[in-house]
Amino acid sequence: MQIIPAIDLKDNKCVRLSEGKDETSVVFNKEPKEQALYFQEIGCKKLHIVDLDAAFGRPSINFNSIVKIRKSISIPIQLGGGIRSATDAEKYFDTGIDNLIIGSMSVNQPDEVLKLANKHNNKIYISLDIKDDDIMIKGWKEKSKLKILDLLNLYKHTPLRGCVITDIKNDGMLKGLNTDFVKKIVSKIESSNMNNDIRIILAGGLTNYNDLINLKKLNLK
């Protein structure tokens, strides 16, 4: 199990949202590059970045901050938020981002995501942003018509890096991990017969050391 710290970017600042709601943002660091350097200096092996403005339909605002972060640290970076086309994806790969996390596009344009995943072998994660058993898209504002298993089955033979699973109701709430949610979603992934090497990244609700202990007890890889 690996712990991956996250930086959520809004207006070129590090923020925390509650349940992914745009209007709830709280700034905790005005210097994203410094936050990224801090995570690297304390020994983190990878960094997770979410471009919230892009996710909410405001692209390009944080692009320069993302480039600065990439240039300032040597650890791998995975990036999500607002990647809605192959052009968007290639733009980030060109900056040196190691892995991309694709949500809405994986639902609405699966053929394009399949092409990207085959071109960039083992570099694409699909994002399952879940609320009340529904996959949410477009900045978590719309319900997808696809159910969880439907989406997983679309990609089960694709050379993905993995799945990023977010418990939206728990995200940013600092209430602790919902292990029942985790068990249910992981069970769905297993029943979809996806590649055994698929990586599962969990987000939403991880608050303290006890959450990590409880997660470890689930024996996830």
Language-model features: locations:
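Active-site/ligand-binding-proximal alpha/beta "capping" segment
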Residues: K68, L146-I201
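Catalytic cores of alpha/beta
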Residues: I73, I77-N99, D180-N193, R199-K221
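N-terminal beta-alpha supersecondary unit
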Residues: K13-S60
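Well-formed, non-transmembrane alpha-helical positions, independent of function
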Residues: Y38-E41, K68, K91, K115, ...
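Active-site-adjacent beta->alpha loops and helix N-cap segments on the catalytic face
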Residues: I3, A54-R70, R84-E90, S104-Y125, ...
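Short, acidic/polar
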Residues: F28-Q40, S85-E90, K143-L154
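Hydrophobic faces of well-ordered beta-strands that scaffold small-molecule active sites
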Residues: I3-L9, L47-I49, I77-G81, L100-I102, ...
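Conserved anion-binding
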Residues: N12-V15, E19-E23, I97-D171
